């Protein structure tokens, strides 16, 4: 399933807030955003199950939970407005749904930046088949 998602992202040119989320990650981590995290651990990328493998994976778990609480728009396809001011990400939408999506992405990007020391290459390209522990609740 995750393979299909990454192919879809490549084919559609990373539209909507996925590219915006990637931009936020780039600014907060200095990494190549989405592609540094797309297959990381049990929760970074499409879907997720099991126990987050480390603090970086937990950022993705919390992000998934946040997206799950958004009502009124599709978080992965919505385009919102945001800016960078003095190194901070500022969400600027009046639409409550778009603002919520932006806040989910903002918090995750900050979380990635704060937890870069936990990023472990052994969790890159991690298979969901290895995520066997019981899933946590949001």
Swiss-Prot record:
Give one Pfam family, short name only: Phospholip_A2_1
List the PROSITE patterns hit by this protein, alphabetically: PA2_ASP (PS00119), PA2_HIS (PS00118)
| Expression sites (tissue/organ) | Expressed by the venom gland.
Signal peptide, first to last residue: 1-16
GO annotation (BP), single: lipid catabolic process
Question: What's the domain of life for this entry?
Answer: Eukaryota
Question: Quick check: keyword Protein transport in the entry?
Answer: no
Q: What are the record keywords, sorted? A: Calcium, Disulfide bond, Hemostasis impairing toxin, Hydrolase, Lipid degradation, Lipid metabolism, Metal-binding, Platelet aggregation inhibiting toxin, Secreted, Signal, Toxin
Q: Where found, per UniProt? A: Secreted
Uppermost EC category: hydrolase
Q: Which InterPro entries match?
A: PLipase_A2, PLipase_A2_Asp_AS, PLipase_A2_dom, PLipase_A2_dom_sf, PLipase_A2_His_AS
Q: One GO MF term, please?
A: phospholipid binding
Q: Which reaction is recorded as catalysed by this protein?
A: a 1,2-diacyl-sn-glycero-3-phosphocholine + H2O = a 1-acyl-sn-glycero-3-phosphocholine + a fatty acid + H(+)
List cofactor names only.
Ca(2+)
List the EC numbers from the record.
3.1.1.4
Q: Does the keyword Calcium apply?
A: yes
**Residues of the active site:** 63, 105
The family this protein is said to belong to: Belongs to the phospholipase A2 family. Group II subfamily. D49 sub-subfamily.
What PANTHER family does the record tag this protein with?
PHOSPHOLIPASE A2 FAMILY MEMBER (PTHR11716), PHOSPHOLIPASE A2, MEMBRANE ASSOCIATED (PTHR11716:SF9)
Record's subunit section:
Monomer.
What is the name of the protein in this document?
Answer: Acidic phospholipase A2 1
Protein source organism: Macrovipera lebetinus (Levantine viper)
């Amino acid at each position: 399933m995750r393979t299909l998602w990454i192919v879809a992202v490549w084919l559609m040119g990373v539209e909507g807030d996925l590219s915006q989320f990637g931009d936020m990650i780039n600014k907060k981590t200095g990494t190549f955003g989405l592609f540094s995290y797309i297959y990381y651990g049990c929760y970074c990328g499409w879907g997720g199950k099991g126990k987050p493998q480390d603090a970086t994976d937990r950022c993705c778990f919390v992000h998934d939970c946040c997206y799950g609480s958004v009502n009124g728009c599709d978080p992965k396809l919505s385009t919102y407005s945001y800016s960078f001011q003095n190194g901070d990400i500022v969400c600027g939408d009046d639409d409550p749904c778009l603002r919520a999506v932006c806040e989910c992405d903002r918090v995750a990007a900050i979380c990635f930046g704060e937890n870069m020391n936990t990023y472990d290459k052994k969790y890159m390209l991690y298979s969901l088949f290895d995520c066997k522990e019981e899933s946590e609740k949001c």
